[in-house]
Amino acid sequence: MLTYLRREWQSFGETVTIKNTFNAQEDNNQSGRKTDNRPVKTEGRYCYKADVNRSKYYHDVQGFSLGQSDLHIDPTQFIMYSGTISNGISYVNQAPSCVQLSLKFTPGNSSLIEDLHIEPYKVEVLKIEHVGNVSRATLLSDIVSLSIAQKKLLLYGFTQLGIQGLTGDVVSVETKRIPTPTQTNLLTIEDSMQCFTWDMNCANVRSTKQDSRLIIYEQEDGFWKIVTETLSIKVKPYFKAYGTMGGAFKNWLVDSGFEKYQHDLAYVRDGVTVNAHTITYVNPSGKAGLQQDWRPATDYNGQITVLQPGDGFSVWYYEDKWQINQAIYAKNFQSDTRAQGYLENVGTLKFKMNYIPAFAEIRNKPGKVNYAYLNGGFAQVDASGYTGMSIILNFVCTGERFYASDNNSRVDNKITPFISYIGDYYTLSGGDFYRQGCCAGFAAGYDDVSPEHGITVSYTVMKPSDPDFITGGENYGESITSDLEVSIRNLQDQINSIIAEMNIQQVTSAVFTAITNLGELPGLFSNITKVFSKTKEALSKLKSRKKTSPMPIAATSIIDKTTVDVPNLTIVNKMPEEYELGIIYNSMRTKKLIEQKKHDFSTFTVATEVKLPYISKATNFSDQFMTSISSRGITIGKSDIIQYDPMNNILSAMNRKNAQIINYKIDPDLAHEVLSQMSTNATRSLFSLNVRKQLHINNSFDTPTYGQLVERILDDGQLLDILGKLNPNSVEELFSEFLHRIQHQLREY
C-alpha cells in the first residue's frame, strides 16, 4: 500500500471545474437586456449609441500628500495628525487657513515634557499669530489655565520641528476640525518658538465641502481604462481569539490563537454609505505560561498564544465604492498614515477547566501590546461574498520583547501592564519576581477587540473600459477555499488532541500490534489519492503558519513529494515500512477507534509526515567527504555505522572500540551534504541506532562481540525476532524515543 500511495501521489494532479450556480438567475436577466445598451467596438474602442454619463469629480481634497508629488495633486494639502505623540511629531504639516482645531491630549501617569509632568486637557485653537518675536495662540479650554507643560506640549506641535523633550509614558492626541467652538474658558498663551500661524476668519470663504475621494487621473484606451484615485477609508482590524481544551479530562489548553476573521462595516463618506470589509491575519509568535507534560490530567496545563513586540498583523480591505472594483491590475500604492495604537485584553478568559463553575476558573493575567502602521500594497482576495482586488495594510507590534525564562526576572512596573500569563499568579509569592513563562503582549483568550483608524490612500488601477466585463467583486459566490479553511481548523484540533492524549503505553502497544498484524493500516479505497493530497495540502498550510526550524531535505518524511523508495543496501532483511508506519499511526489512533477496529485517514496522513533516521555503513561515505567533516571537528573515521536523525539534526556514529554511540549536532547545510552522501546506500528506519543497540544488548541471551553487534543491528530479521519475544511492560522506557519523535513532528503544526 505504501509504495502504491507514494508513487500515485507524486504523479497526482487534477483540474477542478467549478460550476457557477451563484448567478444563474442574474445571467438569465443579463441575456435579456436590450441590445441598445450594448457597446459597439469601433476601431479598437467601445462606443455607445447613447450618451455616456461621466461622473463629476470634486477637487477640494482633505488631507493627503503623496511621498512624491504628482502633477495632478496640489502638494500643499493640509494634513492633521491624530495618534500617539513622539518627539518630532507635528499636529499639522503646514499653516492651515480659516479653521478652528480641537485637540484632546491623553497622557499616561508619568508622561513628561522637558521633565515637567503633563495632565490631560482639551483645547480649541482659534488662531496663532506672530507678535514681535513671540507666537501668540488664542484658544478655548476645558480648564481655567494651562500649566507650563501643557503649553509646551501644545505649541511644540505647531512648529516645523515638532514635539521636543517628551519622555515617560505614551501621550496621545486627537486632532479634528470643528465648525463652532464648544469650550468656555478663553485663554491666550505666548512663547518664543516659531509656530505656524492662521486665523479662523477668512476674507474669501471657500466652499465648506471637504471631499475625501478624488479622481486625479483617468485615461481610456481601447479595452482598458487607467484610473488614479485618492481615497479616505475607515479600517477596523478585528481580533477574535480561539482555543481548544484537550487532555484526558479537557483541562489542558492544547491550542490557542487568532482567527483569520472577516469583519463587515458601513460608514458614510461624502454623504454616501460605503459598505466595507476587512480580513485580519494575525501572526503571533509568543507563548505565555508553561507546558508541563508531567502534570496530572486533573490539573491545568498549557500555554496561551501571545502577539508580542516584533510580531505583525495584516488587514485586507475592500469596499463597494472605489475604483478597485473590477480592476485587474493595481500599482503605486501610497499612504500618508501614521496610524498606531495598542491592543489590550479585555473581559474574562474564555477557557475553563472541566469542573463545576466555582472551580473551573484558570488563573490568568491579561496583557497588551502597542502597534504601528508599517506599509501597504495589493492582493487578490477570495472571501465570503467577494472575489477580487483588495489593499493590504501591514502593522508591526512595537516595544521591547520580554519573556521570563526563569523565576529570577524582577518585577518592572513599566512592563507589568503588558505582561500576559496563564495557569497561576504572574508573580511569585511576595510579588518581587515574575513567574517563569511571563510574556509581554496581547494574549489570544479574551473578548474580541476591534480598533479603528482613518487612513488616506492613493493608487492606480487598470480596469475594463466596457462595464459589461466582470472580473470579480460582490457578484461572486462563497469562497471556494472556505471548506479548506474549515478542514484545516478541524485538522489542527485533531492534532492538538493527539498531542494531549498520547502516552507511552499507547506507543508500546502500537509496536507489538505492528509486529503481529503487519502495521494495522487503513486499506486502499477509491479516490484515496485525492483525499490524501487534500489532507497533505492542509498539513502544509498548517506548517506554514508556524515558525519551524529549517529542514535540510524533505526525503526524510515517510511520504513526501520528494520521497522515493529507499534502497535496502545497509540493513538486511529490511522490515516493510508498513510496520514502522503502523507503529506511528496506531500510536496516534484513539483507543476507541482501535477497539472498534475503525480507521482515521486524517491521522494516517499525519503519520506519513513523520521524519525517520537514516542509517548507513561508514564504508559508503567517500574518503573526500570523511576528510571534509573531520576538518569540522566531527570524527567518525573509526566507526562502522553512521546515522543522521532529522528530529534534532544529529549525526551519530557507533565507535568501533567499545560500541559507544557519539552524537554531533550539525547545521542544516551539513545535514544536506550528509543526506546527499547517504541517499543511494542508506536505509530509513523508525528504529534508530540507539534503540537497535539497546534491544540487542539488553535482550539477547548472550553478550555479542562488537562484530556480532554490528551485524545484528543491521539485520531487521533479528530485530523483529527479539521484539516478538519481549514483554511489552519491560520496554516502555526504550520506546519513549518513538513517543518523543511523534510529538516533535506534531508540534510543527
From Swiss-Prot:
Keyword Protein transport: no
Site (Probable cleavage): 206-207, 213-214
Alphabetical list of InterPro entries matching this protein: Rota_A_VP4, Rota_VP4_MID_sf
GO BP, sorted A to Z: permeabilization of host organelle membrane involved in viral entry into host cell; virion attachment to host cell
Top-level lineage group: Viruses
Statement: the UniProt record of this protein carries the keyword Membrane: yes
Family: Belongs to the rotavirus VP4 family.
HAMAP family reported for this sequence: Rota_VP4 (MF_04125)
The protein, known as: Outer capsid protein VP4
Source organism (scientific name): Rotavirus B (isolate RVB/Human/China/ADRV/1982) (RV-B)
